[in-house]
């Protein structure tokens, strides 16, 4: 055993550590205020959450890989964060209040009904850290979210302040139920109300069933995290079927579901100048780790088929685009027809209604017959692309009008 250097108190058997290691120093509020800590290795952080830089929580390590948090996980691994065992004896109470959430009832009861739960809880931080909770509400409302939906938020999780949550054992059933649910792959999302004057807008709660601890993560990039978590919640609601029963998480070829809805278009018919309306349930996927804000997207997208040869002038704008993958389901005959048309030199132009409040105004849909996939291109320069595609459509309409006039003239001459 290494002998401690200049211990201020003798660490005998009756010491705070039972005769092993350096004893705990008695804490006073004055000492905590005057203590000077080195700068955080994470770099300067916004002062709205933490008044000064402080070292990361002891026993917390940041890894590069993402991993699930299951009942057998050795620590908290979401977002590459592994949290070791912590004791409350050397932590400062930062907040006290009530945490409320809704828990699904047992399978033998009504599946659509949820049971409201509430527990008194406290949030603790390390000595020397400052978490401004003066403006926090006395009741926090938590929403339970499957952890596998949060894999795209790894970078935002890594840049977070940690706080340990402790629940008072007044309601053992509620606490056991929360541990059971969160130990089986769920995380807690606490969205602070807009009427609250505090700077924190969202806080995530994770549970380690092995360490028996609850850890709160307060992202420094609150705005980015709020937008990302809203997209996750919206996607989750879209995946919930009738009766509130949620299906498995939609992941195709390591891509994450970003939007679900209906795609509608008009398809040329054999009769001259005749078209038939077609539609298909469609889904948009992005790479894991990417975020596509679709909460303001309409539920139905309207597509116009355009000959690809008319789009050659827009190639520079195509290069500066974001790629997403489209997936269509259900009507196999309609899907085959769409593949045949797009494989014969057509592209799809999806116009967003001006009533929609989203930033995207147009996206292009292309089909690869070799890979059997539909690729969507969302130009970053939306304004110039909209103007360019309008010119293309106007030129196409002029060409069609001239062709129609020529056909009529030929028929008249032949008669």
From Swiss-Prot:
Region (Interaction with FLOT1): 184-415
Annotated segments matching region Disordered: 1-54
Covalent S-S links between cysteines: none
Processing and modification events after translation: Ubiquitinated by the CRL2(KLHDC2) complex, which recognizes the diglycine (Gly-Gly) at the C-terminus, leading to its degradation. Ubiquitinated by the CRL2(APPBP2) complex, which recognizes the Arg-Xaa-Xaa-Gly sequence at the C-terminus, leading to its degradation.
Domain of life per record: Eukaryota
Keywords assigned: Activator, Cell membrane, Cytoplasm, Membrane, Nucleus, Phosphoprotein, Transcription, Transcription regulation, Ubl conjugation
A GO biological process held by the record: positive regulation of transcription by RNA polymerase II
Residue numbers of Phosphoserine PTMs: 53
Location(s) in or outside the cell: Cytoplasm; Nucleus; Cell membrane; Cytoplasm, Perinuclear region
Primary location: cytoplasm
Ranges annotated as biased composition (Gly residues): 12-21
Biased segments, Low complexity type: 24-40
GO cellular component, as recorded: nucleus; perinuclear region of cytoplasm; plasma membrane; transcription regulator complex
Function: May activate transcription. Required for nuclear translocation of FLOT1. Promotes cell proliferation.
Family recorded in the similarity comment: Belongs to the Mediator complex subunit 25 family. PTOV1 subfamily.
Subunit structure: May interact with CREBBP. Interacts with FLOT1.
Protein name as it appears in the record: Prostate tumor-overexpressed gene 1 protein homolog
